[in-house]
C-alpha cells in the first residue's frame, strides 16, 4: 500500500505546477494550523473557566458560520478571478490579521475589554479567507495533473492539508509549552500569532512562483464568460443544477454532510471528555496534553488515509470504498471508541481519522471528475459550506443531546450505529447508478468497468 502511494506521488511529482501547488498548500495550512491552535488555546483553555459544548458551538459559529452563509456569494469569483492571485492576496491580508491578533492578546485584560470582539472578528476573517483559498486551490488542481490522475491527486492534496495543520499545531504547542517558564501565557499567545504571520508571508512568496494564469479558471462556456459577478444567487442555482446532473458528485456531498454531523458530534464529545470528565477545570495543561495526543492520532489517521484509499479504490472502486469507510467508522466508533480511557480514545481517533479523511478523498475525487471546470469554484465553495456548517450543527446537537462532560455510552454507541447506517443508505441509494459511474476520472476506470461487465 505504501509502495503504491509513493509510486503515485512520484507520478504526480513530475508536474512542476503540482509541486508548486503542494508547497503553497502545505505552507498556508501550516500557518492556519498555528493560528487556530493559538485561537483555541486563548479562548477555550483558560484556567478560570470550564468550556462546555455550547461554548465550543459558539466559537465554531463565530469562526465558521459567516463564510458558510456568504460562501455562495463569493464562490462565483473563483470561476472568474485569477486563482494564483487569490492565493497571493488572501495570505497578504492574513499576515496583517495575524499580527493584529498578536498585538491584541498582549493585553492581559482583553477578555473583559470591548476589543475582544475585534479579536473574534480577526479570527473570523482569517478562517474565512483560509476556506476561500482552499476552495480555489481545490478548483485549480485539475490544471496541475493529467485527467486520469484525479484520484491520486485527490488522495494527496486533502492529506497535505492535515499534515500541514499538524506541523503548524506542533509549532504552536511547542511555543506554548516551551516558553511557559519565561513568558506569561498571553505573551506566548502573541508569539504564536506572530509565527503564523511569518508563515502566511512565506505562502505569498511560494504562490508568486506559480505563473500568473497557470491555475485557471478556463472561461470556456458562454455562461462563465457572460454571467455578471453580482448574479451570485443565479450562479449558485446553476451549480446546484449542475450537481443534479452529475449525480455521483451531488450524492457524495450529501453523504459527507451527514457523516460530518455524526463525526463532529464524536469529536466535540471527546474534547469535552478530556477537558471536563478526565480532568478538573484547573488542570489545563493535562487536558491540553491529552487532547493534543488524541488530535495528533487523528491527524496521523488523516495522513495514513492517503496511502490507503488509492489501492482500496483500485481494488473495489470509489463507490464501494465509500461504503467500506463509513461502515468501518461505525464499528470503530463502537469499539474502541465507546470505551472511555485515554488510549482507547486515542486509538479510535486514529481509526476514525483514517475513515473520515478517506471519505473526503473519495468525495473530492467525485467532484474533480464529474464537475466541469466552469462550476468547480462554486461547487468546492458549496462543498466547504456543507463541510463546516455541518460541524457547527454537530456542536449544537452535542450541546442539546449529550451531557456537559461528554460522558455517555449510549450516545457514543448510537453515533457509531448511525455512521454504519449512512454507509448502507449510500449503497442502496446508488445501486441503480452502478459502481463504474463513480470511477470516472480515475486510473482504474476501464478495469473497473470491465470487472463490472464480467460480473
Question: Where in the sequence are the language-model features?
Answer:
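Helix-loop junctions on the cytosolic side of multi-pass membrane transporters
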Residues: 108, 139, 143, 189, ...
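Substrate-agnostic recognition of the 12-TM MFS/MFS-like secondary transporter fold
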Residues: 20-36, 62-78, 82-97, 118-179, ...
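Primarily residues marking transmembrane-helix entry/exit sites
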Residues: 14-22, 53, 112-120, 245-253, ...
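A single, central transmembrane helix in multi-pass transporters
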Residues: 22-41, 176-193, 235-306
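Juxtamembrane intracellular "pre-TM" segments in multi-pass secondary transporters
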Residues: 1-19, 213-254, 444-450
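Extracellular/periplasmic helix-loop-helix junction of adjacent transmembrane segments
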Residues: 34, 38-67
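C-terminal transmembrane bundle of multi-pass solute transporters/carriers
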Residues: 2, 57, 62, 69, ...
Amino acid at each position: 500500500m505504501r509502495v503504491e502511494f509513493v509510486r503515485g506521488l512520484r507520478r504526480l511529482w513530475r508536474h512542476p505546477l503540482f509541486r508548486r501547488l503542494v508547497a503553497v498548500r502545505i505552507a498556508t495550512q501550516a500557518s492556519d494550523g498555528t493560528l487556530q491552535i493559538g485561537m483555541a488555546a486563548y479562548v477555550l483553555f483558560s484556567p478560570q473557566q470550564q468550556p462546555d459544548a455550547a461554548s465550543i458551538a459558539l466559537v465554531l459559529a463565530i469562526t465558521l458560520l459567516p463564510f458558510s452563509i456568504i460562501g455562495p456569494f463569493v464562490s462565483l469569483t473563483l470561476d472568474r478571478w485569477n486563482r494564483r492571485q487569490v492565493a497571493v492576496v488572501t495570505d497578504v491580508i492574513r499576515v496583517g490579521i495575524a499580527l493584529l491578533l498578536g498585538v491584541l492578546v498582549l493585553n492581559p485584560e482583553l477578555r473583559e475589554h470591548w476589543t475582544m470582539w475585534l479579536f473574534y472578528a480577526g479570527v473570523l476573517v482569517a478562517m474565512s479567507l483560509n476556506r476561500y483559498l482552499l476552495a480555489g486551490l481545490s478548483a485549480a488542481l485539475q490544471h496541475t495533473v493529467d485527467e486520469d490522475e484525479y484520484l491520486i491527486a485527490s488522495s494527496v492534496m486533502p492529506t497535505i492539508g492535515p499534515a500541514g495543520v499538524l506541523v503548524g499545531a506542533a509549532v504552536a504547542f511547542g511555543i506554548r509549552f516551551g516558553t511557559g517558564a519565561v513568558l506569561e501565557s498571553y505573551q506566548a499567545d502573541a508569539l504564536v500569532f506572530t509565527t503564523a504571520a511569518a508563515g502566511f508571508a512565506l505562502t505569498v512568496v511560494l504562490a508568486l512562483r506559480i505563473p500568473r494564469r497557470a491555475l485557471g479558471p478556463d472561461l470556456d462556456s458562454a455562461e462563465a464568460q457572460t454571467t455578471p459577478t453580482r448574479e451570485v444567487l443565479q450562479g449558485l442555482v446553476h451549480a446546484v443544477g449542475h450537481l443534479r446532473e452529475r449525480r455521483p458528485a451531488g450524492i457524495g456531498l450529501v453523504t459527507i454532510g451527514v457523516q460530518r454531523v455524526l463525526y463532529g458530534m464524536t469529536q466535540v464529545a471527546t474534547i469535552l471528555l478530556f477537558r471536563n470528565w478526565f480532568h478538573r477545570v484547573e488542570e489545563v495543561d493535562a487536558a491540553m496534553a491529552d487532547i493534543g495526543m488524541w488530535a495528533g492520532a487523528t491527524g496521523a489517521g488523516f495522513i495514513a488515509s492517503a496511502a490507503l484509499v488509492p489501492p482500496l479504490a483500485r481494488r473495489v472502486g470509489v463507490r464501494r470504498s465509500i461504503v467500506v469507510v463509513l461502515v468501518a467508522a461505525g464499528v470503530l466508533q463502537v469499539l474502541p471508541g465507546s470505551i472511555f480511557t485515554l488510549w482507547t480514545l486515542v486509538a479510535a481517533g486514529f481509526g476514525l481519522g483514517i475513515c473520515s479523511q478517506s471519505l473526503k478523498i473519495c468525495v473530492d475525487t467525485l467532484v474533480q471528475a464529474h464537475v466541469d471546470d466552469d462550476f468547480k469554484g462554486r461547487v468546492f465553495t458549496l462543498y466547504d459550506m456543507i463541510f463546516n456548517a455541518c460541524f457547527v450543527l454537530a456542536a449544537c446537537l452535542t450541546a442539546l443531546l449529550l451531557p456537559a462532560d461528554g460522558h455517555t455510552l449510549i450516545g457514543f454507541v448510537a453515533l457509531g450505529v448511525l455512521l454504519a447506517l449512512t454507509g448502507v443508505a449510500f449503497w442502496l441509494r446508488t445501486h441503480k447508478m452502478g459502481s463504474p459511474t463513480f470511477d470516472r476520472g480515475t486510473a482504474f476506470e476501464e478495469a473497473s468497468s470491465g470487472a463490472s461487465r464480467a460480473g
